[in-house]
Amino acid sequence: MVFAHDTEEALIAAAALVNTAEEPDSLLSTQDLATFYVEAGWKGQHAGDEGELTDVKELRPTLRRMWLADIPEQVECVNSLLREASALPQVVRHDEFDWHLHATTPEQPLATRMAVEAAMALVDVLRMGETERLKVCDAQGCEHIFADLSRNRSRRYCSVACSNRMAAAAYRDRKSDADDEPSMSAGSPTDEEQ
């Protein structure tokens, strides 16, 4: 594990939220948000109304900017998100998780909790000097972000699907290059015969 469990979960959830904005947008309705809420493992207050959907959608560009920024801008964004939410870090233990930090209460609005959890995770990334783990997928045509949690920081793609797509494209390119090379057929002269 590169970071504490709660940090890794928050990074994964933040990237997943940002990636919902990529075409086609996958947060178009309150039902889409309800599905995302469950799949991303969120707990606590979830109004499930249009206002909450709007607030969550408006958070996505801020998180993407924070993810891709240089370190001084990341710090500024983190501090701004924490300040706006009046975040107050508390050590807590709940469910199956051991002691960890939360800087919001479960009763605060979902978008606020999402912003603060992402900001708190980025605090850990910054403090450990691991910002190079915040990446954009290398697959052609994909702009998804992800946290590279591999041991050697070598992950290049946001998903297995992108990795497979790029591997297949590279194979087709190699195959095409091999097919374009002149072959030595039975009737062609060799260098010695010329």
Q: What are these language model-derived features?
A:
Residues R165-S176:
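Short metal-binding segments enriched for Cys and/or His
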Residues N152-S163:
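Cysteine-rich micro-motifs
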Residues M1-V136, Q140-D148, A178-Q194:
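Short helix-coil boundary/hinge micro-motifs
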